[in-house]
Amino acid sequence: MLRHTVMWRFHEQAEGAEKGVNIEKAKALLLSCAHVVPGIRAFVVATATPGMDCTHDVVLHMLVDDAQVLAAYQNHPQHVAIKPFMKAVVQERCCMDFVV
């Protein structure tokens, strides 16, 4: 099994919208990809809790069967379609994949 974790920090304003609006849109777009390929065992999208000490605004945690499933997810048209929006609204992205 492989764990895929991505964290994003958003611009205060981008694409004509405030940060909070873009965070909610990003969360919905990411969640729409939860079942696009077989082999995704867990798919969690969370947003920073107000008042907590957070360095990023949104986190994605995925558990997949193997690297082939992750590659299929990353290349799936539905996932590829959200990348332009994410690139426009995100200030910083951090990613880590590891075997569990």
Spell out what each predicted region is.
Residues 64-89:
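C-terminal structural segments of small proteins and small subunits
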Residues 1-57, 65-71, 99-100:
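Short S/T/G/P-rich N-terminal loop/turn motif that feeds into the first structured element of a domain
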Residues 91-96:
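Interfacial aromatic-anchored transmembrane helix boundaries in multi-pass membrane proteins
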